[in-house]
Amino acid sequence: VYPEFKRLQATSCLHFDLSHFRLPLPIAVEMNIFLELIYLLFFLLYCYLESIFRLVVPVKRKSVKGKIILVTGAGHGIGKELALEFSRLGGILVLWDINKANNDATADEIREEGGTAYTYVCDVSKLDDIKRVSDQVYRDVGNVDILVNNAGILHGGELLKIKEEDIRRTFDINTMAHFWTLREFLPSMLERNEGHIITVASMAGKAGSAYLVDYSASKFAVFGMTEALSEELHHLHKDGIKTTTVCPMFVDTGLTKYPQGRFGKILSPKEVALEAIDGALKDHVVVMVPRSIQVSVVLGQLFPYRFRRRLKEFVGFGILPQYESSKSSDNKHT
């Protein structure tokens, strides 16, 4: 029986002595399953009612004042805007980027506004670099309260025209780096049963797109990783550690060239950062930007696959085929 149902039994004002009553085992098992199904139906109703209620009375945002917040890829784009906005909310920022000049520029802006920032040059594609810099963060700043895995890279083009080293680098930065940073900073969160992991993924990690095969695959991976991690934390009874996955559409960070789309607009990094922070501080599990895309994603699952493909063509979601694999570096992020 589910834990909530057990607690209901334990705290109920009605007590029956059934110690002398025994059902045959097959019937008892079926009764148990039936009761669990009843509980699930009531819990489903409760969840819907709560969602409707929250449309009228939104969840209050939690405070990050004095919290230590680490942002990877903080020198540019979404990472920079996330760092600036978190600082304005009172957070202590730990900035990682491979580009020292860009990282220092972000820190300077934070300090000019009266905030606190620590900067570290780190190539998140290299495990040894992550381990070295993580140790330094523990010594200089302390335990990280909020880990923002944002650094990303994109090499667009036809799959067979993308260089092998570019595919490997895409996964090293967009996917594997998330595992390595988690292995460094999650243990201290587990000890305290407190923390927040924010994963910057992409809508390309919810719906595959032509000429973004490697990129889409890397973002699908981190979406699944964060979802699985959330389930693992729940099973470990570490519900004080929250996870949020951010899935923006095309963002003007300099990564995506020749984007196409008949509807909507290219998002600015600041728009994405504001939506991401608002969702994370309300402990939302998934934040899609713009919010209107959530309806399309939910409804899209109800349609046949061929129709969904035709719908993508109608909307024009993706990048143009003339976008060839280009030289990119991970100081540009999604």
Task: Give the ranges of each region predicted by the language model.
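Conserved amphipathic alpha-helix within the SDR
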Residues: 111, 118-121, 127-142
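Active-site helix of classical SDR
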Residues: 182, 218
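Canonical Rossmann dinucleotide-binding motif of NAD(H)/NADP(H)-dependent dehydrogenases/reductases
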Residues: 54-94
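Substrate-binding pocket helix/loop in short-chain dehydrogenase/reductase
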Residues: 158-159, 163-168
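Residue(s) in the substrate-gating loop at a strand-loop-helix junction
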Residues: 202
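SDR active-site lid
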Residues: 232-293
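Conserved glycine-rich Rossmann-like NAD(P)H-binding loop of the short-chain dehydrogenase/reductase
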Residues: 89-105
